[in-house]
Amino acid sequence: MFPRRLLPASLIVLGVLFGASAQASPAHGQAFGKPAQAAQASRSIEVVLGDMYFKPRAIEVKAGETVRFVLKNEGKLLHEFNLGDAAMHAEHQKEMLEMQQSGMLTPTGMASMDHSQMGHGMADMDHGRMMKHDDPNSVLVEPGKSAELTWTFTKATRLEFACNIPGHYQAGMVGQLTVQP
C-alpha cells in the first residue's frame, strides 16, 4: 500500500512533470519563437554564467533572427539559461523548486533518483522519461562546462534570460533580452 503521507507530494510531482513534458516537446515553441538548429543561426552570442550573474547582462536581437547562444558556466554551481518573460520564469521556478525538493536537482548537477523507495506501483513507472529538464527554451550548464541553445525569435518583444534554479533569479541572475522589429 502507498503511504498516505507520500501520496500528495507524489501527485504534485507527477502533475508538474507531466505538464512540463507536454510543454517541452520539441514541436512546441513559445509565443516569441521556436528552437532551431545551430546551422540555421545567423550569429553566435557567447554568454558567461557565473555564480549569480550573466555576462553580458543585456542582449539585443531582431525578429526573424536565429541566434546560437554559446553558454559557458565559469561558476562553481549548476546554472540555467532560460528564455522567457517574467511570468514564464516565475512558473518555471516552481518546477525547479519541485526538482530540488525531490533531490533530483543538486547544487552542481542533476541527480538520478531511486524510485523503488517511493511505494507500491511507483517503481514500475518510467520516471527517467518524466523527470527531465528538457524545455526547448532552456538548458542547464554544470560548473566548468559549456552548452548551446539555438533559437529563432519570431516577433518583437521584451524578454529575459534567467537562471531559475531556486534562489538564483532572486539573487540577480537575470538579464534583459530585447527583440527588435
Curated annotation (Swiss-Prot):
Provide an example Pfam family for this protein. Answer: Copper-bind
Record localization? Periplasm
A Gene Ontology cellular-component term: periplasmic space
Q: Which residues form a coiled coil?
A: none
The record's GO molecular-function terms, alphabetically, read:
copper ion binding; electron transfer activity
Swiss-Prot/TrEMBL induction comment: Induced by copper stress.
Task: Identify the residues that bind Cu(2+).
Answer: 79, 163, 168, 173
Question: Keywords assigned by UniProt?
Answer: Copper, Metal-binding, Periplasm, Signal
Gene3D superfamilies in UniProt: Cupredoxins - blue copper proteins
- The positions making up the signal sequence are 1-24
Q: What happens when the gene is disrupted?
A: Disruption of the gene leads to a copper-sensitive phenotype.
Name the SUPFAM superfamilies on file: Cupredoxins (SSF49503)
Return the InterPro entries for the record: BlueCu_1, Cu-binding_ET, Cupredoxin
User: Which domain of life does the UniProt lineage start with?
Assistant: Bacteria
Q: Which PANTHER family match?
A: AURACYANIN-B (PTHR38439), COPPER-RESISTANT CUPROPROTEIN COPI (PTHR38439:SF3)
Q: What does this protein do?
A: Involved in copper tolerance.
**Which family does the record assign?**
Belongs to the CopI family.
Also noted in the record is: Restores the copper-resistant phenotype in the R.gelatinosus deletion mutant under anaerobiosis.
What is the recorded name of this protein? Copper-resistant cuproprotein CopI
Species assigned in the record? Pseudomonas aeruginosa (strain ATCC 15692 / DSM 22644 / CIP 104116 / JCM 14847 / LMG 12228 / 1C / PRS 101 / PAO1)
For this protein's source organism, the top of the classification is: Bacteria, Pseudomonadati, Pseudomonadota, Gammaproteobacteria, Pseudomonadales
Q: Which gene encodes it?
A: copI
